[in-house]
Structure formats: C-alpha cells, structure tokens
C-alpha cells in the first residue's frame, strides 16, 4: 500500500468489535490478506470493541449472552474478573492469532462514492479507495438521551449508562433509573445496594422471560427486528423483543422491591420528577439507561437512509448500494448474530468482486 496518498484495497472493515473481527476472520479464511486485500479500522484505543468500556463491576460471570468469535473459543475465564478485561484480552489474542492487523485508533469520518466504482473511505490515517465496505461500527459512540420537560432545571446530576462506573458513585443518593433493558436492570440492582433510595421508571412495562430461550423463539425475535430493517425503519434492539431473562439475582431483587417499576414521569423539576397524577419523587441523580443508536453518520454522503429513517437491508447488503454491508446492525446486533452476519457479508462481497465465484460456497 502507498501510505503517502490514497490507498487502494478490495475491502475496508470499519470496526473491530465482535462483528468486525468475525468478518475479518472470514475474509482471511477465503484467501484475502490483511493490509493487502483488506484493512480493518477501529476507532477504539485497544482491542475489545465496546466491551472495553463496560463498567468495572460487570463481571464476566454476569455477562448476558457473550458468544465466542469464529474459530476460537473463550475458555477458562475467571467469572469474577471484569468483563472488559476478559473480553478485551480474548479479542487481543484473537487478533494476534489470526494476524488481522487492526489499525487503531482510526476514526472513519466519511464514506463517499469515488471513481471506478470504488468507495472513498476518509479516515484519520488517510483515505482508502475500496471496492466494498463492511460497516461494523456498532452503537457505543451514540448513546441515546431522551428529552423530557424540565431537564434543564433539574439541579442534580444526569448521566447516561455508558458513563456508569459502579455503585460507589451513588452512595447515599436518591437515584431514578430510566430504561427497561439489561443494563438498566443490572445497574439498578447494583446501585440499590449503596443508594439511599432507587426508583425505576420505564416507558412500557418490562417483559421478564422465564425459562430457556429456544432456537425457534430466537428466530422469531430476530425476524421481528429484521422486518423493520427490511422496511427501512430504524432497528429495534433484539432484547426489546426477546425480553429480559429472569435470573436468581433478579428474583431476589424483585422480592426486595428493587424491581418495582413506575411508568415514565411527565417532567423533571429542580429536585426530582413528577407525574400527571401529582405524585413526585425526589432525586439527586437521573441515570438514563436508554440504550444506543447505530453509529452510521459517516455513511451519510452515500444517502442510504430510507424515508423511515433507517437503512434498508437485503441480508447484510444495503439496498441502495450493494457495495456496503452493515453487520452488528438490527437483526445481527447480538454476538451470535454478528458472527453469522460477518460470514454472510464476506460471502456476498466475494461474489460481488468475483462474479465467477457466484455459484461457489
């Protein structure tokens, strides 16, 4: 590659989390060479994807649904060790074992149409002219902050769950946790042990799932998310349709009253929250465990979005530009889904770049 100017490559993989590494693995497996035929660019400072930013008290033993990367199992991990350390070390070993040569930290700033049917990927280390893009940029960089009347007058602290570092930061405080997902429940249960009082509010009643989640249920849940993506709507998270798996820790928290949920408040005041029926809750901190949105603003120059606000996909391929594949997006936004999407994207890109292989595996 010529590092003094625009570098040409066959495939750019943007993002080195679960989805990006899975795609890079499959590119190598079918004969593509890193830094010759493809390049992996990662915004994060070190291996681990979004896992490296998880709060220290989230141990590996409490992680919900971590699936191994293709070609290498994660074995012998200490369940009491922080998940950020366990999975960060696993990803690091994976990158080195398969020689994926991830470039980091590299910001992907924009992707535009270039000459000769190539895409121009503008980054902090220069521009790549590529024949295909696998976008695996995830959601971590786009935490979703809901808007409520009175947010500007609340005198306490407001933070997003992405900035949560542990229950010690809430000792003796009155805390309102907003959100009905896995992070909301995990952080609420931790905070309840040190806070003076906790209040849990959600837009809809949370759905707790008892018992095993079989393959048929999993496929049905993914199909519901995929339906939105095929319609060009912003994707829902998979957990929003699968529900929250009830654990023993959750049962105990529910018995203690920690998981008693209130509907979403109507507005914030200087000292807390208020509802339309006149009830109020005093608070020192509002914690928004309200999820994330896809980090895809760099794709804006390609005009891939549909009127509904999302990018319509056929499998992993963007309908408006078949050179662009989104993985870890919508129905593949789970660790096992990301693995499968990485394989699918590589198969379709290989057929795009080598039409003579269209009937191959």
What are these regions (language model features)?
Residues 73-79:
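A short acidic, helix-capping loop that chelates divalent metal ions and anchors anionic groups
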Residues 2-45, 49-50, 79-361:
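Flavin (primarily FAD) cofactor-binding/catalytic cores of flavoenzymes
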Residues 46-71:
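Redox-cofactor-proximal catalytic regions of oxidoreductases
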Residues 66-73, 228-233:
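Short, basic/glycine-rich phosphate-binding loops at helix/coil junctions
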